[in-house]
Amino acid sequence: MARSPVEPPASQPAKRAAWLRAELERANYAYYVLDQPDLPDAEYDRLFVELQRIEAEHPDLVTPDSPTQRVGGEAASGFTPVVHDKPMLSLNNGFADEDVIAFDKRVADGLDKATDLAGTVTEPVEYACELKFDGLAISLRYENGRFVQASTRGDGTTGEDVTENIRTIRAIPLTLKGKRIPRMLDVRGEVLMFKRDFARLNERQRAAGQREFANPRNAAAGSLRQLDSKITASRPLSFFAYGIGVLDGADMPDTHSGLLDWYETLGLPVNRERAVVRGAAGLLAFFHSVGERRESLPYDIDGVVYKVNRRDEQDRLGFVSRAPRFALAHKFPAQEALTKLTAIDVQVGRTGAITPVARLEPVFVGGATVTNATLHNEDEVRRKDIRIGDTVIVRRAGDVIPEVVSAVLDRRPADAQEFVMPTECPECGSRIERLPDEAIARCTGGLFCPAQRKQALWHFAQRRALDIDGLGEKIIDQLVEQNLVRTPADLFNLGFSTLVALDRFAEKSARNLIDSLEKAKHTTLARFIYALGIRHVGESTAKDLAKHFGSLDPIMDAPIDALLEVNDVGPIVAESIHQFFAEEHNRTVIEQLRARGKVTWPEGPPAPRAPQGVLAGKTVVLTGTLPTLTREAAKEMLEAAGAKVAGSVSKKTDYVVAGADAGSKLAKAEELGIPVLDEAGMHTLLEGHAR
């Protein structure tokens, strides 16, 4: 069903109502029949409320087939239609506390409950409260305790026969238990998929190379409406009973809560997250309690449901149009909404990660007004085909950062622009680089970039780096936020008067920090390299670089081929080191650190190149515990013979020396057919080299 023509303005109510009806019907068809919802709930609700308002203001515009007069879509071909003996109606919705208070007032008035002079209800109504599941509504028919038929809600009057598929759901009893078994019982409830089961299902889909489901609701609906019940049987579906249709041969419980208690005695699954409360205050307390726990629930819900508890009071209140007067669905703030994407900027993280960020026309979603949403990375923007000018679906759940889920392609304007990742950092102008096989692009100005300033300073001061005692995160925050320190070099310009002026920084603390900074000026080359915070360069690699080159300048000027000669440095690490020193901003900060004797270290000649021999150019991996040699001693012997000692096994590994308790490295070597030596074999190899 194609999307409706151009949206008419509100000043033309007849055309506007016709457009709204067509748009809602199209959305209903996608939701109920195709199981491919393409309109967020909040947008559907907004359009539905607008149509209700227009029809209330212009009764002559109401049509018999208006969505306000019925519930949802048609039966899909391939399933036998089932006419419900008692219609499966939807509920009126409430979105704010005021809607709940108004509902309680209407109910109290309808039941002639006592009120005071101010109109406040003094005889509170008793309500049954339960969760509103985000699944698929169904009706189960039992005859003399045996399950005989299941049908979907469909349009509320006619649904689809899904009996064989429902039989596969283990949570649904095929035979009722207990003593009060009715001749006929229609159980109303919801088929859903728990979050953990949804995650496992998508894992299976990925492993099989099949399409993943967008959310548990889509997975449940798609599973239930399979023509092949074997597919349904393989899907982890669940069920909760919450209502009743036809009942014959047994007494109807006096209350709704009593009905659910009776269902439990019959062996039907009933959700335990329910309560009986009194008045609007009780309803709102239940709503807010559930809202606080919503994210931790094992299944998705989109609100709670209130029902007048006493059956006789339900009968007195009756129904209006498409919904009962005695019930209300109180929805949580929508987690998805439509809005326009006006621009895509990039944001620089503390580690230099470049993240595309969508700038949005303000939209209320997930309980807050959202104007920005993450696009994660460049690949995600391409995969989702999101462009500037698109109408997009934005999702915000709980405290999760808002994200753009997808673009609404048939609303894309002709002038929509594709996103182009910038080549320079917007914060500092340094080059943006993206290493092979990495999804994240990064700013290369690690020592200079304002966005990375706090992280760079914190790493620089670490105990294993320059070990600047007393320079913690809170002090760094103050120094950066007061613009006292921009780069690590600025730390060594800090004076006593500057430090004592900081919040909660006593004279003794200031003197101690100045002493630590003075001490940090005398370090080692390995510590200094590590302190620079070069991506992928840890303590061990920093030591290997210092040992191999002997001084800093050769490292800064080394081409990638020269870096690859360093022990344990592979292509990714070599590329990262090369990029760091190729960025002029980083070199400037390093020169500032070295200028006027600020930071010094003893330098020496580069490590002697290993003599040529059987191990020259060979890569060896050590694993396990050797009988007589420590790992370090064995490494020195191998390197002296010209070998490169690596930390992991790959196709480029020439030998693996294995001792006791060798683990995955030994297994990998055997899998790749790499020669494995014990300590004696290593000595034999070295002796062969010596000769």
Swiss-Prot record:
EC class of the enzyme, as a word: ligase
Pfam families membership: BRCT, DNA_ligase_aden, DNA_ligase_OB, DNA_ligase_ZBD, HHH_2, HHH_5, Nlig-Ia
Chain segments annotated as transmembrane: none
Keyword DNA damage: yes
Domain BRCT: 610-691
Reaction(s) catalysed by this chain's protein: NAD(+) + (deoxyribonucleotide)n-3'-hydroxyl + 5'-phospho-(deoxyribonucleotide)m = (deoxyribonucleotide)n+m + AMP + beta-nicotinamide D-nucleotide
Record GO cellular component, one term: cytosol
Purpose of the protein: DNA ligase that catalyzes the formation of phosphodiester linkages between 5'-phosphoryl and 3'-hydroxyl groups in double-stranded DNA using NAD as a coenzyme and as the energy source for the reaction. It is essential for DNA replication and repair of damaged DNA.
Cofactor dependency: Mg(2+); Mn(2+)
NCBIfam families found in the cross-reference section: dnlj, PRK07956.1
Name of the featured protein: DNA ligase
Swiss-Prot/TrEMBL GO biological process terms: DNA repair; DNA replication
Keywords: DNA damage, DNA repair, DNA replication, Ligase, Magnesium, Manganese, Metal-binding, NAD, Zinc
Binding locations of Zn(2+): 425, 428, 443, 449
Sequence similarity: Belongs to the NAD-dependent DNA ligase family. LigA subfamily.
Record EC number: 6.5.1.2
Residues at the catalytic site: 132
Cystine pairings recorded for this chain: none
Chain sites annotated for binding NAD(+): 41-45, 90-91, 130, 153, 190, 307, 331
GO molecular function, one term: DNA ligase (NAD+) activity
